[in-house]
From Swiss-Prot:
Alphabetized GO MF terms: bile acid-gated sodium channel activity; ligand-gated sodium channel activity; proton channel activity
Name this protein carries in UniProt: Bile acid-sensitive ion channel
Cytoplasmic compartment segments: 1-61, 481-505
Disulfide bonds: C112-C207, C185-C192, C298-C377, C315-C373, C328-C350, C330-C342
Name of the encoding gene: ASIC5
């Protein structure tokens, strides 16, 4: 043990000797040399005003210049603090710009019949209304009473018909689009047909999208305002029906206007056109650009697996699909993703409780940067203005009745006319921008330094060099002091003993 302590002492002494030897090669400047170094810095630095403190012979002038320099340093420190404080509040500005163009891309439009099911298919199959109510819960939560008659019937049906595919039923027995339901279609003066529409499932069952991103129509552009898409639908109320008990009491067409790259979102965004009416819709294109965090709330690094472009609605669907797949081992057909399709039994036993859990725990949230689905960094919307007129007129009623070989009452109760066009060939860009960029901040700080102190980046480097040199000399001074103190050795033990004996005498 004693041997170990001795070896440590020898090692420390050896290290100190090495430090002392190294410092002896670079001796500490004398006080005169250090004073000269300080004087040379004061008269040569580009920090204006300091040389006046040193070189002036008058003490009054020296004091005045000292006050001026200290005041300038205080002011520039205050100004820099204010600007840094303002920068780190991440301020933004909003710019609005209107761009006029010769041609504009036409948006996608998704149409659905408010009466979702074929009458003959559901005449003896009334439980399908409640089944679809359960299935479409994945798109937006609905209050479902567990003790209701419809719920019990749906549960019993799901237990006894395990191989039943509600997807195929809706596809085959829901609303369809052909020449009997789409009586007339015209896009920018050219005829179109049901083939130009892409099928899509929504909470309204079978819906059809014109100008879908995967069709050739999506590449067409409108070059004249006031012209666009003109459609004449036959909702055929006798052939299609719905359940008024679930809130479906209207007759007509519901449609939503959206970007061709995005899926339709009806919840709160659908436009209605009732039967016996001509709906004229004028739209504008509005592009909104949001800044990323911390200036804004968007996150440019989020990519969706099943959609080409990011949207909060698409993100919410993927979020729900991931939780359901993890807990239930299947994916609802109304949600994106790959995997086993959830059967009816899974909807009751697993999917519905998981959706309630997602809502209760806020597992899929929208809005801020730290939510599951923050706002889009860039989104395109189509604000619409809609006006109605009675359709058809008395003269047109006679013409259509003869052309379609239908009664006037049938024409009034089943036909819907819809026109969609741009109000102007321009689009508005609303852009959120950084109020202060890094380059602007540096320029502002440099301006403050130059205004109050006549300083620049080179001046700051000079001051840093001066402070570092003095700090280096202070370190050398203390290291030399430490090495001198370690050279002192205590007096031998026998001397202490003799001293004690003398004191005793």
């Amino acid at each position: 043990m004693e041997q170990t302590e001795k070896s440590k002492v020898y090692a420390e002494n050896g290290l100190l000797e090495k430090i002392k030897l190294c410092l002896s090669k670079k001796p500490l400047p004398s006080p005169t040399e250090r004073k000269k170094f300080d004087h040379d810095f004061a008269i040569s630095t580009s920090f204006h005003g300091i040389h006046n403190i040193v070189q002036n012979r008058s003490k009054i002038r020296r004091v005045l210049w000292l006050v001026v320099v200290l005041g300038s340093v205080s002011l520039v420190t205050w100004q820099i603090y204010i600007r840094l404080l303002n920068y780190f509040t991440w301020p933004t500005t909003t710019s609005i710009e209107v761009q006029y163009v010769e041609k504009m891309e036409f948006p996608a439009v998704t149409f659905c019949n408010l009466n979702r099911f074929q009458t003959d298919a559901v005449a003896k199959f009334g439980v399908i209304f409640f089944l679809w109510h359960i299935v479409s819960k994945v798109l937006h939560l609905q209050e479902i009473t567990a003790n209701s008659t419809g719920s019990r019937e749906a549960t019993d049906f799901a237990a006894s018909h395990q191989n039943f595919s509600i997807v195929e039923f809706i596809r085959n027995k829901g609303f369809y689009l052909n020449n009997s339901t789409l009586l007339d279609c015209e896009f920018f003066g050219k005829p179109c047909s049901p083939k130009d529409f892409a099928h899509v499932f929504t909470e309204y069952g079978n819906c059809f999208t014109f100008n879908h991103g995967e069709t050739l129509q999506a590449k067409r552009k409108v070059s004249v305002s006031g012209r666009g898409l003109s459609l004449l639908f036959n909702v055929n109320q006798e052939a299609f029906t719905d359940n008024p008990a679930l809130g479906f009491v209207d007759a007509g067409i519901i449609f939503v206007i959206h970007s061709p790259k995005k899926v339709p979102q009806f919840d709160g965004l659908g436009l209605l056109s009732p039967v016996g009416m001509h709906a004229r819709v004028t739209i504008r294109q509005v592009k909104t650009v949001h800044q990323e965090y911390p200036w804004g709330e968007c996150n440019p690094n989020i990519k969706l697996q099943n959609f080409s472009s990011y949207s909060t609605s698409g993100c919410l669907k993927e979020c729900k699909a991931q939780h359901i797949k993890k807990q239930c081992g299947c994916v609802p057909f109304l949600l994106p993703g790959y995997g086993i399709e959830c059967d009816l039994q899974k909807y009751f036993s697993c999917v519905s409780p998981v959706l309630d859990h997602i809502e209760f725990k806020d597992l899929c949230t929208v809005g801020t940067h730290n939510s599951s689905c923050p706002v889009s960094c860039e989104e395109i919307e189509y604000p619409a203005t809609i006006s109605y007129s009675s359709f058809p007129s008395q003269k047109a009623l006679k013409y259509l009745s003869k052309k379609l070989n239908q009664s006037r009452k049938y024409i009034r109760e089943n036909l819907v006319k819809i026109e969609i066009n741009y109000s102007d060939l321009n689009y508005k860009i609303t852009q959120q921008q950084k109020a202060v960029s890094v380059s602007e901040l540096l320029a502002d700080l440099g301006g403050q330094l130059g205004l109050f102190c006549g300083a620049s980046l080179i001046t700051i480097i000079e001051i840093i060099e001066y402070l570092f040199t003095n700090f280096y000399w202070i370190c050398i001074f203390f290291l030399l002091k430490i090495s001198e103190m370690t050279q002192w050795t205590p007096p031998p033990q026998n001397h202490l003993g003799n001293k004690n004996r003398i004191e005793e005498c």
